[in-house]
């Protein structure tokens, strides 16, 4: 009995430590998300074509950071101010967009599971801070842009999402198209950049303005210009 308990404890500890051991290896390569793996194993449709950060339209990272995590370049994996605002809103009975940073979403997508869970959040916080400490900001953003879900039929990453929405590579997206891509990120199954509704178009306009703002910090190389 004790042996079985010991083996179980070791297995649990090993599973908890595995993401921390794998993270340094993700400085290179083309990592996949747990959701991508699940869809592949379950036989559901799934498409992802990796695109290097340098090949993406310069408007994409700016639009996504402007929409998802404006303090991405200054926090260390967790935006504590945004988190406090979310908790205050929840206490007041207001339901708004979550306060997860891009780094938290990378932690969740790479190693954890979707859905709301206190246990998942407890695992996500230290893992996000570890990812921020181990990987460069540009690499974190590159991974996020390549593993986020971007379409209703298993389109993962900006390349698959761009080809689905606009019929061409993410390399040549305009600022408007990049903003439309950013606007559907909370729910790419119900929102569409291909046939954007009034709400998506309105959000895209807002994100275009934010992406051009001088105060939006950049912590990645932009060799192509914008």
Curated annotation (Swiss-Prot):
One Pfam family, short name: Transgly
Record's bilayer topology term: Single-pass membrane protein
Catalytic activity line of the entry: [GlcNAc-(1->4)-Mur2Ac(oyl-L-Ala-gamma-D-Glu-L-Lys-D-Ala-D-Ala)](n)-di-trans,octa-cis-undecaprenyl diphosphate + beta-D-GlcNAc-(1->4)-Mur2Ac(oyl-L-Ala-gamma-D-Glu-L-Lys-D-Ala-D-Ala)-di-trans,octa-cis-undecaprenyl diphosphate = [GlcNAc-(1->4)-Mur2Ac(oyl-L-Ala-gamma-D-Glu-L-Lys-D-Ala-D-Ala)](n+1)-di-trans,octa-cis-undecaprenyl diphosphate + di-trans,octa-cis-undecaprenyl diphosphate + H(+)
InterPro entries linked: Glyco_trans_51, Lysozyme-like_dom_sf, PBP_transglycosylase, Pep_trsgly
GO cellular component terms given for this protein: peptidoglycan-based cell wall; plasma membrane
Highest taxon of the lineage: Bacteria
GO biological process: cell wall organization; peptidoglycan biosynthetic process; regulation of cell shape
EC number of the protein: 2.4.99.28
Cell wall biogenesis/degradation keyword on record: yes
Subcellular location: Cell inner membrane
UniProt keyword list: Cell inner membrane, Cell membrane, Cell shape, Cell wall biogenesis/degradation, Glycosyltransferase, Membrane, Peptidoglycan synthesis, Transferase, Transmembrane, Transmembrane helix
Metabolic or biological pathway: Cell wall biogenesis; peptidoglycan biosynthesis
Molecular-function annotations in GO: pentosyltransferase activity; peptidoglycan glycosyltransferase activity
Top class in the EC scheme: transferase
UniProt keyword Plastid present: no
Regions crossing the membrane: 5-25
Functional note: Peptidoglycan polymerase that catalyzes glycan chain elongation from lipid-linked precursors.
Family of this protein: Belongs to the glycosyltransferase 51 family.
NCBIfam families in alphabetical order: mono_pep_trsgly (TIGR02070)
The name this protein goes by in its record: Biosynthetic peptidoglycan transglycosylase
Organism lineage string: Bacteria, Pseudomonadati, Pseudomonadota, Alphaproteobacteria, Hyphomicrobiales
């Amino acid at each position: 009995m004790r042996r079985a308990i010991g083996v179980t404890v070791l297995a649990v500890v090993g599973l908890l430590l595995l993401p921390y051991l794998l993270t340094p290896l993700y400085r290179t390569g083309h990592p996949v998300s747990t959701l991508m793996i699940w869809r592949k194993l379950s036989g559901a449709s799934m498409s992802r074509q990796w695109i290097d950060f340098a090949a993406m339209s310069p408007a994409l990272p700016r639009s996504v950071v402007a929409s998802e995590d404006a303090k991405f370049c200054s926090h260390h994996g967790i935006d504590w101010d945004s988190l406090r605002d979310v908790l205050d809103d929840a206490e007041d009975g207001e339901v708004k967009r979550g306060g997860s940073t891009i780094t938290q979403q990378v932690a969740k997508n790479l190693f954890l599971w979707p859905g709301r869970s206190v246990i998942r959040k407890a695992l996500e916080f230290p893992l996000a801070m570890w990812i921020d400490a181990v990987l460069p900001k540009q690499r974190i953003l590159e991974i996020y842009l390549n593993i986020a879900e971007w379409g209703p039929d298993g389109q993962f990453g900006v390349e698959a999402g761009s080809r689905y929405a606009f019929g061409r590579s993410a390399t040549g997206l305009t600022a408007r198209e990049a903003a439309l891509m950013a606007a559907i990120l909370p729910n790419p199954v119900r929102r569409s950049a291909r046939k954007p509704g009034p709400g998506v178009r309105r959000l895209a306009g807002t994100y275009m303005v934010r992406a051009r703002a001088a105060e939006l910090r950049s912590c990645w190389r932009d060799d192509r210009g914008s």
